Swiss-Prot record:
A zinc finger (C4-type) spans 57-72. Belongs to the RecR family. This is Recombination protein RecR. GO terms for biological process: DNA recombination; DNA repair. The keyword GTP-binding does not apply. It comes from Aeromonas hydrophila subsp. hydrophila (strain ATCC 7966 / DSM 30187 / BCRC 13018 / CCUG 14551 / JCM 1027 / KCTC 2358 / NCIMB 9240 / NCTC 8049). The lineage of its organism: Bacteria, Pseudomonadati, Pseudomonadota, Gammaproteobacteria, Aeromonadales. May play a role in DNA repair. It seems to be involved in an RecBC-independent recombinational process of DNA repair. It may act with RecF and RecO.
Amino acid sequence: MKFSPLLDEMMKALQVLPGVGPKSAQRMAFTLLERERSGGLRLAQLLSRALTEIGHCSHCRTFTENERCEICANPKREENGLLCVVESPADVAAIEQTGQFSGRYFVLMGHLSPLDGIGPEELGLEILERRLKDEAISELILATNPTIEGDATAWYIADMARAAGVKVSRIAHGVPVGGELELVDGTTLSHSLMGRQPLN
């Protein structure tokens, strides 16, 4: 069904968000216009501001409004010498929410994918290589996604780290906590068996 051209444009624009199809976009647009106009205006203002003002940290490449993000600006995060490499700022947020990591990050903003034209330069690996040589990094933790591209990216970076004399580790992959073995796919189970840990 056709609505006003502006409403149609609004619904198409909402579909750029992940998981939002035509029906969800229509529901969101109608909600904003029917009963959330002030919230919609606030959202529009914040979106405009965020898209204009938020850039990348010059040190780790995560999102920030400043030259350096809060994590990179915090000297306590340098003390243990840990550097964790992730694919996206969302991965930084996920790790930070665990409260288990107190080191620093490097955000690739993707993974190696020659077919899509994404090579080492697009991932800022020259910046990472410089950090490996110039900073006191005791261990590089590779937390790329457990995909073919994520694994290839991890191996590429591991070679770089070894060449710089930095210890390298990869986050564990496997059976989720509370999961049942019979429901786990073969690849995940295989990774779990290969990455098994001794019980002390």
